[in-house]
Amino acid sequence: MAASVPTAAASPLPVRFELPAPTGPYSVGITELHLVDQARQDPWVPTAVRELMVTIRYPATVNGTSPTPFMSPAVAEVTADEDAATLKIDPAELDYGFTTHSNLNAHAVPGRRPVVLYSPGGSRSRSMGASLMEQLVSEGYVVVAIDHTHEAPAVEFPDGRVARRALPPSSIEVGKRLIATRVQDTGFVLDQLEVLARGGNPDAGRRRLPHGLGRSLDLGRIGMVGHSAGGFTAGETMVSDRRIDAGANLDGSMAYSQSARDFGRVVNEGLDRPFLLMSAGNHSAASDPSWREFLTNHRAWARQLHLPEGEHFTFTDYQVLLPRLDIDPAALAPLIGTVDPARSTAAQRAYLTAFFDQHLRHRPQPLLDGPSDRYPDVRFPS
Protein backbone atom coordinates (compact mmCIF):
# COMPACT_ATOMS: atom_id res chain seq x y z
CA MET A 1 0.00 0.00 0.00
CA ALA A 2 1.24 3.46 -0.84
CA ALA A 3 -1.31 5.87 0.64
CA SER A 4 -1.24 6.88 4.30
CA VAL A 5 -4.20 7.31 6.62
CA PRO A 6 -4.72 9.07 9.96
CA THR A 7 -4.04 7.35 13.25
CA ALA A 8 -6.70 4.96 14.52
CA ALA A 9 -7.53 4.16 18.12
CA ALA A 10 -5.31 1.40 19.47
CA SER A 11 -6.86 -2.03 19.90
CA PRO A 12 -5.57 -4.56 22.43
CA LEU A 13 -6.61 -7.53 20.27
CA PRO A 14 -6.24 -8.36 16.57
CA VAL A 15 -9.28 -7.82 14.41
CA ARG A 16 -10.98 -11.02 13.26
CA PHE A 17 -10.45 -11.19 9.51
CA GLU A 18 -12.25 -13.50 7.10
CA LEU A 19 -12.75 -13.79 3.37
CA PRO A 20 -16.15 -14.25 1.73
CA ALA A 21 -16.83 -17.90 1.02
CA PRO A 22 -16.50 -19.00 -2.60
CA THR A 23 -19.87 -19.69 -4.21
CA GLY A 24 -19.10 -22.27 -6.90
CA PRO A 25 -19.88 -25.99 -6.70
CA TYR A 26 -16.34 -27.18 -5.88
CA SER A 27 -14.43 -27.19 -2.60
CA VAL A 28 -10.94 -25.70 -2.69
CA GLY A 29 -7.71 -27.64 -2.19
CA ILE A 30 -4.34 -25.97 -1.77
CA THR A 31 -0.67 -26.91 -1.88
CA GLU A 32 2.66 -25.14 -2.32
CA LEU A 33 5.60 -25.76 -4.61
CA HIS A 34 9.17 -24.67 -4.00
CA LEU A 35 10.68 -24.15 -7.46
CA VAL A 36 14.39 -23.58 -8.09
CA ASP A 37 15.65 -22.33 -11.45
CA GLN A 38 19.24 -23.57 -11.44
CA ALA A 39 19.86 -21.93 -14.82
CA ARG A 40 19.06 -18.41 -13.64
CA GLN A 41 20.80 -16.09 -11.23
CA ASP A 42 18.54 -14.08 -8.95
CA PRO A 43 18.48 -10.52 -10.35
CA TRP A 44 18.11 -8.89 -6.92
CA VAL A 45 20.52 -11.08 -4.92
CA PRO A 46 23.20 -12.10 -7.45
CA THR A 47 24.84 -14.61 -5.11
CA ALA A 48 21.75 -16.85 -5.29
CA VAL A 49 19.94 -18.85 -7.94
CA ARG A 50 16.33 -17.91 -8.57
CA GLU A 51 13.95 -19.59 -6.11
CA LEU A 52 10.17 -19.21 -6.19
CA MET A 53 7.25 -20.22 -4.02
CA VAL A 54 3.93 -20.81 -5.73
CA THR A 55 0.53 -21.72 -4.36
CA ILE A 56 -1.69 -24.08 -6.34
CA ARG A 57 -5.41 -24.10 -5.59
CA TYR A 58 -7.59 -26.70 -7.27
CA PRO A 59 -11.07 -28.28 -7.10
CA ALA A 60 -10.86 -30.84 -4.32
CA THR A 61 -12.48 -33.42 -2.11
CA VAL A 62 -11.89 -32.06 1.39
CA ASN A 63 -12.83 -34.97 3.68
CA GLY A 64 -10.35 -35.15 6.56
CA THR A 65 -8.36 -32.07 5.52
CA SER A 66 -8.00 -28.75 7.29
CA PRO A 67 -8.26 -25.14 6.08
CA THR A 68 -5.00 -23.23 5.70
CA PRO A 69 -3.99 -19.81 7.02
CA PHE A 70 -4.03 -16.75 4.78
CA MET A 71 -0.27 -16.32 5.29
CA SER A 72 2.43 -18.27 7.09
CA PRO A 73 3.46 -16.79 10.46
CA ALA A 74 6.70 -15.26 9.16
CA VAL A 75 5.08 -13.68 6.09
CA ALA A 76 2.09 -12.53 8.14
CA GLU A 77 4.35 -10.75 10.61
CA VAL A 78 6.35 -8.88 7.97
CA THR A 79 3.21 -7.91 6.04
CA ALA A 80 1.45 -6.74 9.20
CA ASP A 81 4.41 -4.56 10.13
CA GLU A 82 4.43 -2.91 6.69
CA ASP A 83 0.67 -2.43 6.50
CA ALA A 84 0.44 -1.12 10.06
CA ALA A 85 3.01 1.55 9.25
CA THR A 86 0.85 2.69 6.32
CA LEU A 87 -2.37 2.55 8.33
CA LYS A 88 -0.75 4.07 11.45
CA ILE A 89 -2.01 1.33 13.74
CA ASP A 90 -0.45 -1.28 16.00
CA PRO A 91 0.74 -4.31 13.98
CA ALA A 92 -0.94 -6.50 16.61
CA GLU A 93 -4.28 -5.47 15.14
CA LEU A 94 -3.46 -7.19 11.84
CA ASP A 95 -3.68 -10.96 12.13
CA TYR A 96 -2.95 -12.28 8.64
CA GLY A 97 -2.87 -15.83 9.96
CA PHE A 98 -6.64 -16.17 9.78
CA THR A 99 -8.18 -19.27 8.20
CA THR A 100 -9.11 -19.32 4.51
CA HIS A 101 -11.49 -21.61 2.63
CA SER A 102 -8.59 -23.58 1.08
CA ASN A 103 -7.86 -27.09 2.39
CA LEU A 104 -4.30 -28.35 2.61
CA ASN A 105 -3.28 -31.19 0.28
CA ALA A 106 -6.84 -32.38 -0.29
CA HIS A 107 -7.35 -34.90 -3.09
CA ALA A 108 -8.02 -33.29 -6.46
CA VAL A 109 -11.43 -33.90 -8.00
CA PRO A 110 -10.94 -36.09 -11.11
CA GLY A 111 -11.00 -34.29 -14.45
CA ARG A 112 -8.79 -31.90 -16.39
CA ARG A 113 -9.26 -28.21 -15.57
CA PRO A 114 -8.21 -24.97 -17.23
CA VAL A 115 -5.33 -23.28 -15.44
CA VAL A 116 -5.14 -19.61 -14.42
CA LEU A 117 -1.91 -17.97 -13.26
CA TYR A 118 -2.00 -15.12 -10.71
CA SER A 119 0.71 -12.47 -10.39
CA PRO A 120 0.36 -10.02 -7.47
CA GLY A 121 0.86 -6.28 -7.51
CA GLY A 122 4.23 -4.65 -7.06
CA SER A 123 5.79 -5.45 -3.68
CA ARG A 124 2.73 -7.52 -2.73
CA SER A 125 2.35 -11.11 -1.59
CA ARG A 126 0.79 -13.85 -3.68
CA SER A 127 -1.70 -14.29 -0.81
CA MET A 128 -3.46 -10.97 -1.40
CA GLY A 129 -5.69 -12.26 -4.18
CA ALA A 130 -7.07 -15.25 -2.28
CA SER A 131 -10.73 -14.28 -2.53
CA LEU A 132 -10.66 -14.13 -6.33
CA MET A 133 -8.53 -17.27 -6.55
CA GLU A 134 -10.80 -19.31 -4.28
CA GLN A 135 -13.81 -18.28 -6.33
CA LEU A 136 -12.22 -19.33 -9.62
CA VAL A 137 -11.29 -22.69 -8.11
CA SER A 138 -14.81 -23.20 -6.82
CA GLU A 139 -15.97 -22.70 -10.43
CA GLY A 140 -13.66 -25.44 -11.67
CA TYR A 141 -10.29 -23.79 -12.40
CA VAL A 142 -6.81 -24.60 -11.14
CA VAL A 143 -5.19 -21.35 -10.00
CA VAL A 144 -1.43 -20.93 -9.56
CA ALA A 145 -0.24 -17.87 -7.61
CA ILE A 146 3.37 -16.76 -7.93
CA ASP A 147 5.47 -14.90 -5.39
CA HIS A 148 8.19 -12.82 -7.05
CA THR A 149 11.04 -13.36 -4.60
CA HIS A 150 12.84 -10.31 -3.14
CA GLU A 151 10.03 -8.11 -4.46
CA ALA A 152 7.27 -9.43 -2.18
CA PRO A 153 7.52 -8.25 1.45
CA ALA A 154 8.62 -11.74 2.49
CA VAL A 155 8.72 -15.21 0.95
CA GLU A 156 9.07 -18.20 3.27
CA PHE A 157 10.67 -21.40 1.96
CA PRO A 158 9.99 -24.91 3.29
CA ASP A 159 13.25 -25.00 5.27
CA GLY A 160 12.22 -21.89 7.22
CA ARG A 161 14.35 -19.36 5.33
CA VAL A 162 12.59 -16.04 4.77
CA ALA A 163 13.60 -13.95 1.74
CA ARG A 164 12.87 -10.29 2.38
CA ARG A 165 12.38 -7.56 -0.21
CA ALA A 166 15.69 -6.54 -1.78
CA LEU A 167 14.86 -4.08 -4.55
CA PRO A 168 17.13 -1.16 -5.43
CA PRO A 169 15.71 2.39 -5.49
CA SER A 170 12.93 2.87 -8.01
CA SER A 171 13.84 3.95 -11.54
CA ILE A 172 12.72 3.27 -15.09
CA GLU A 173 15.52 0.75 -15.55
CA VAL A 174 14.67 -1.03 -12.30
CA GLY A 175 11.04 -1.15 -13.42
CA LYS A 176 12.07 -2.79 -16.68
CA ARG A 177 14.21 -5.33 -14.87
CA LEU A 178 11.36 -6.02 -12.45
CA ILE A 179 8.83 -6.78 -15.19
CA ALA A 180 11.37 -8.81 -17.17
CA THR A 181 12.08 -10.86 -14.04
CA ARG A 182 8.38 -11.45 -13.49
CA VAL A 183 7.98 -12.60 -17.09
CA GLN A 184 10.87 -15.05 -16.66
CA ASP A 185 9.37 -16.25 -13.37
CA THR A 186 6.05 -16.91 -15.10
CA GLY A 187 7.63 -18.83 -17.96
CA PHE A 188 9.60 -20.97 -15.52
CA VAL A 189 6.45 -21.73 -13.52
CA LEU A 190 4.72 -22.82 -16.73
CA ASP A 191 7.66 -25.10 -17.50
CA GLN A 192 7.34 -26.71 -14.06
CA LEU A 193 3.59 -27.14 -14.44
CA GLU A 194 4.35 -29.11 -17.60
CA VAL A 195 6.59 -31.38 -15.51
CA LEU A 196 3.76 -31.80 -13.01
CA ALA A 197 1.20 -32.56 -15.73
CA ARG A 198 3.50 -35.28 -17.13
CA GLY A 199 3.51 -37.02 -13.75
CA GLY A 200 6.72 -35.53 -12.37
CA ASN A 201 7.29 -33.65 -9.13
CA PRO A 202 8.91 -30.25 -9.72
CA ASP A 203 9.11 -29.37 -6.02
CA ALA A 204 12.75 -28.80 -5.07
CA GLY A 205 12.38 -30.97 -1.96
CA ARG A 206 10.23 -33.57 -3.74
CA ARG A 207 7.56 -33.11 -1.10
CA ARG A 208 4.51 -35.28 -1.55
CA LEU A 209 1.87 -33.71 -3.80
CA PRO A 210 -1.92 -33.96 -3.47
CA HIS A 211 -3.44 -37.04 -5.05
CA GLY A 212 -4.50 -36.39 -8.65
CA LEU A 213 -3.10 -32.84 -8.85
CA GLY A 214 -0.97 -33.30 -11.97
CA ARG A 215 -3.78 -35.03 -13.85
CA SER A 216 -6.09 -32.07 -13.16
CA LEU A 217 -3.97 -29.63 -15.20
CA ASP A 218 -5.21 -28.89 -18.72
CA LEU A 219 -2.28 -26.92 -20.07
CA GLY A 220 -4.01 -26.49 -23.40
CA ARG A 221 -6.22 -23.92 -21.67
CA ILE A 222 -4.20 -21.35 -19.73
CA GLY A 223 -5.20 -17.88 -18.57
CA MET A 224 -3.41 -15.27 -16.49
CA VAL A 225 -4.62 -12.48 -14.24
CA GLY A 226 -2.65 -9.97 -12.23
CA HIS A 227 -3.15 -6.90 -10.10
CA SER A 228 -1.21 -3.71 -10.86
CA ALA A 229 2.32 -4.78 -11.89
CA GLY A 230 0.89 -8.28 -12.06
CA GLY A 231 -1.52 -7.16 -14.77
CA PHE A 232 1.38 -5.64 -16.69
CA THR A 233 3.20 -8.95 -16.18
CA ALA A 234 0.26 -10.87 -17.66
CA GLY A 235 0.34 -8.77 -20.82
CA GLU A 236 4.11 -8.82 -21.22
CA THR A 237 4.23 -12.58 -20.71
CA MET A 238 1.57 -13.10 -23.37
CA VAL A 239 3.72 -11.22 -25.90
CA SER A 240 6.55 -13.73 -25.59
CA ASP A 241 4.79 -16.90 -24.41
CA ARG A 242 1.97 -18.26 -26.52
CA ARG A 243 1.04 -20.84 -23.93
CA ILE A 244 -1.22 -18.23 -22.31
CA ASP A 245 -4.55 -18.03 -24.14
CA ALA A 246 -6.25 -15.12 -22.32
CA GLY A 247 -5.18 -12.44 -19.85
CA ALA A 248 -6.63 -9.92 -17.42
CA ASN A 249 -5.09 -6.77 -15.99
CA LEU A 250 -6.58 -5.50 -12.72
CA ASP A 251 -5.80 -1.76 -12.60
CA GLY A 252 -2.18 -1.97 -13.73
CA SER A 253 -0.41 0.61 -15.84
CA MET A 254 1.52 -0.92 -18.73
CA ALA A 255 4.13 1.82 -18.92
CA TYR A 256 7.58 2.20 -17.45
CA SER A 257 7.10 5.96 -17.80
CA GLN A 258 3.80 7.50 -18.85
CA SER A 259 5.29 10.95 -19.41
CA ALA A 260 8.04 9.60 -21.68
CA ARG A 261 5.58 7.22 -23.36
CA ASP A 262 7.93 4.38 -22.49
CA PHE A 263 5.46 1.51 -22.81
CA GLY A 264 5.74 -2.25 -22.58
CA ARG A 265 5.85 -4.49 -25.62
CA VAL A 266 2.25 -5.51 -24.96
CA VAL A 267 1.23 -1.89 -25.56
CA ASN A 268 3.38 -1.23 -28.61
CA GLU A 269 2.66 -4.54 -30.32
CA GLY A 270 -0.78 -5.44 -28.97
CA LEU A 271 -1.97 -9.02 -28.60
CA ASP A 272 -3.84 -11.49 -30.79
CA ARG A 273 -5.57 -13.18 -27.83
CA PRO A 274 -8.36 -11.98 -25.51
CA PHE A 275 -7.51 -9.44 -22.83
CA LEU A 276 -9.60 -7.87 -20.07
CA LEU A 277 -8.86 -4.51 -18.44
CA MET A 278 -10.46 -3.68 -15.08
CA SER A 279 -9.89 -0.31 -13.44
CA ALA A 280 -11.09 1.74 -10.48
CA GLY A 281 -11.40 5.33 -9.29
CA ASN A 282 -9.82 7.84 -11.66
CA HIS A 283 -7.84 5.21 -13.54
CA SER A 284 -9.08 4.02 -16.94
CA ALA A 285 -8.06 4.21 -20.57
CA ALA A 286 -9.26 7.81 -20.50
CA SER A 287 -6.50 8.69 -18.02
CA ASP A 288 -3.86 6.07 -18.87
CA PRO A 289 -2.01 6.53 -22.19
CA SER A 290 -0.62 3.00 -22.02
CA TRP A 291 -4.14 1.55 -21.95
CA ARG A 292 -5.28 3.75 -24.85
CA GLU A 293 -2.30 2.73 -26.95
CA PHE A 294 -2.80 -0.92 -26.05
CA LEU A 295 -6.45 -0.85 -27.14
CA THR A 296 -5.42 0.80 -30.42
CA ASN A 297 -2.87 -1.92 -31.18
CA HIS A 298 -4.78 -4.91 -29.79
CA ARG A 299 -5.93 -7.41 -32.42
CA ALA A 300 -8.38 -9.63 -30.54
CA TRP A 301 -11.31 -9.52 -28.12
CA ALA A 302 -10.90 -6.81 -25.47
CA ARG A 303 -13.12 -5.26 -22.85
CA GLN A 304 -12.63 -2.48 -20.33
CA LEU A 305 -14.61 -2.57 -17.07
CA HIS A 306 -14.56 0.22 -14.50
CA LEU A 307 -15.45 0.52 -10.80
CA PRO A 308 -15.71 4.31 -10.35
CA GLU A 309 -16.21 4.09 -6.57
CA GLY A 310 -13.27 1.72 -6.10
CA GLU A 311 -9.55 2.42 -5.84
CA HIS A 312 -6.33 0.59 -6.67
CA PHE A 313 -6.48 -1.95 -3.82
CA THR A 314 -10.13 -2.71 -4.52
CA PHE A 315 -8.76 -5.57 -6.64
CA THR A 316 -7.05 -7.26 -3.68
CA ASP A 317 -8.20 -8.82 -0.43
CA TYR A 318 -7.70 -5.45 1.25
CA GLN A 319 -11.15 -4.63 -0.15
CA VAL A 320 -12.83 -6.94 2.36
CA LEU A 321 -10.20 -6.92 5.14
CA LEU A 322 -9.53 -3.24 5.82
CA PRO A 323 -13.17 -2.24 6.50
CA ARG A 324 -13.10 -4.53 9.55
CA LEU A 325 -10.53 -2.29 11.23
CA ASP A 326 -11.49 0.50 13.59
CA ILE A 327 -10.57 3.16 11.04
CA ASP A 328 -12.79 5.86 9.57
CA PRO A 329 -14.00 4.62 6.15
CA ALA A 330 -13.14 8.01 4.70
CA ALA A 331 -9.53 7.41 5.69
CA LEU A 332 -9.52 4.07 3.88
CA ALA A 333 -11.07 5.51 0.73
CA PRO A 334 -7.71 6.34 -0.96
CA LEU A 335 -6.85 2.65 -0.76
CA ILE A 336 -10.10 0.78 -1.42
CA GLY A 337 -12.59 3.49 -2.40
CA THR A 338 -16.12 3.87 -1.11
CA VAL A 339 -17.72 1.00 -3.02
CA ASP A 340 -19.56 -1.57 -0.92
CA PRO A 341 -16.96 -4.32 -0.28
CA ALA A 342 -19.37 -7.24 -0.66
CA ARG A 343 -20.83 -5.91 -3.92
CA SER A 344 -17.39 -5.08 -5.28
CA THR A 345 -16.03 -8.53 -4.52
CA ALA A 346 -19.07 -10.28 -5.99
CA ALA A 347 -18.78 -8.22 -9.17
CA GLN A 348 -15.07 -8.88 -9.61
CA ARG A 349 -15.60 -12.60 -9.08
CA ALA A 350 -18.46 -12.69 -11.57
CA TYR A 351 -16.75 -10.77 -14.37
CA LEU A 352 -13.41 -12.54 -14.01
CA THR A 353 -15.07 -15.95 -14.03
CA ALA A 354 -17.19 -14.94 -17.03
CA PHE A 355 -14.08 -13.79 -18.90
CA PHE A 356 -12.25 -17.07 -18.43
CA ASP A 357 -15.42 -19.11 -19.01
CA GLN A 358 -15.85 -17.40 -22.37
CA HIS A 359 -12.25 -17.58 -23.53
CA LEU A 360 -10.90 -20.78 -21.94
CA ARG A 361 -14.08 -22.86 -21.86
CA HIS A 362 -15.62 -21.22 -24.94
CA ARG A 363 -18.96 -20.67 -23.23
CA PRO A 364 -20.57 -17.37 -24.34
CA GLN A 365 -21.10 -14.99 -21.42
CA PRO A 366 -23.75 -12.28 -21.95
CA LEU A 367 -22.50 -10.63 -18.74
CA LEU A 368 -19.53 -9.35 -20.76
CA ASP A 369 -21.74 -7.66 -23.35
CA GLY A 370 -22.86 -4.64 -21.32
CA PRO A 371 -23.95 -3.23 -17.94
CA SER A 372 -25.85 -5.55 -15.60
CA ASP A 373 -28.46 -4.70 -12.98
CA ARG A 374 -26.89 -7.43 -10.84
CA TYR A 375 -23.60 -5.51 -10.62
CA PRO A 376 -24.53 -1.81 -10.72
CA ASP A 377 -21.09 -0.67 -9.53
CA VAL A 378 -19.42 -1.81 -12.76
CA ARG A 379 -19.32 0.49 -15.79
CA PHE A 380 -18.48 -0.31 -19.41
CA PRO A 381 -16.45 2.68 -20.69
CA SER A 382 -16.97 3.43 -24.37
Model regions: which residues?
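C-terminal catalytic-base region of ester-bond hydrolases, centering on the histidine
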Residues: 16-21, 295-382
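Alpha/beta-hydrolase active-site loop
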Residues: 150-219
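Short substrate-entry loop that stabilizes the transition state in hydrolases
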Residues: 97-156, 256-257, 284-285
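Active-site machinery of serine-nucleophile hydrolases
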Residues: 59-62, 71-86, 127-168, 308
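Primarily recognizes the serine-hydrolase "nucleophile elbow" in alpha/beta-hydrolase
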Residues: 189-264
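Domain-level recognition of soluble alpha/beta enzyme cores
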Residues: 11-116, 334-341, 352, 361
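The feature captures the conserved acid-bearing segment of alpha/beta-hydrolase catalytic domains
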Residues: 110, 245-313
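Secretory targeting and sorting signals
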Residues: 1-10
